[in-house]
Amino acid sequence: MDGTVCRELLFDDGGAWMQTKTELRITALPDAVMAAIKASQYATYRIDDADFIETLTGEWYLVELESGKQEVKLRIDATGKIL
């Protein structure tokens, strides 16, 4: 917990950093990410959870969407590209 921001850090067995996951408010998602969701086949789904993921190889937003009992997780980069 960093003030009001919750972060999870992942390290390998040798203690080297591998990943940071930062929980986000839905309102903190960039416009490009929101536009990608609205333009996708999941446009009618509700955003349930959002995280910002940082790794050695890249960064992306992990967005969990729900519609009834259906659930999907999308990886979206800062430009709005669904990975």
Where are these regions (language model features)?
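Acidic (E/D-rich), amphipathic helical modules within compact regulatory domains
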Residues: 1-24
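Exposed beta-strand-loop-beta-strand "reactive/processing" segments of non-cytosolic proteins
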Residues: 1-9, 51-75, 82
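Aromatic side chains
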Residues: 11, 42-45, 61
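Short coil turn/linker residues within repeat-based beta-strand modules
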Residues: 14-17, 76-81
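Short, surface-exposed linear patches
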Residues: 19-21, 32-33, 40-41, 68-70, ...
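Surface-exposed beta-strand edges and their flanking turn/coil or helix-capping segments
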Residues: 24, 32-35, 62-63, 75-78
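Short, non-transmembrane alpha-helical segments in secretory-pathway proteins
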Residues: 24-49
